[in-house]
């Protein structure tokens, strides 16, 4: 099964939205990586991983960049996200 990783921070309403979207889609098996306490280093890493995005949340499937909360919501609503996570 493909692995979903989501970079978040604790006080981010968009990150809370992602958690809700994933729960509504029945997706419970994902890794949440908090940037709290190491924001500068993690934001630099996000810039490198995404090709320029430094904001959170940002999502990856098997190290392939998927997008932000809007992208995840769109993929979850269409059912595509579940298909992307299937083995």
Protein language model regions, located:
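Non-catalytic, surface beta->alpha helical segment in thiol-disulfide oxidoreductase systems
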Residues: 61-87
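Local sequence-structure signature of Cys/Sec-based thiol-disulfide redox active-site neighborhoods
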Residues: 1-33
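Conserved short-loop catalytic and cofactor-binding motifs
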Residues: 30, 34, 47, 69
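Thioredoxin-like thiol-disulfide oxidoreductase module
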Residues: 35-54, 83-87
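Structural micro-motif
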Residues: 50-60, 69
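Short, low-complexity, polar/charged sequence segments that are solvent-exposed and flexible
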Residues: 24-27, 49-52, 78
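Amphipathic alpha-helical interface surfaces
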Residues: 14, 18, 42-45, 68, ...
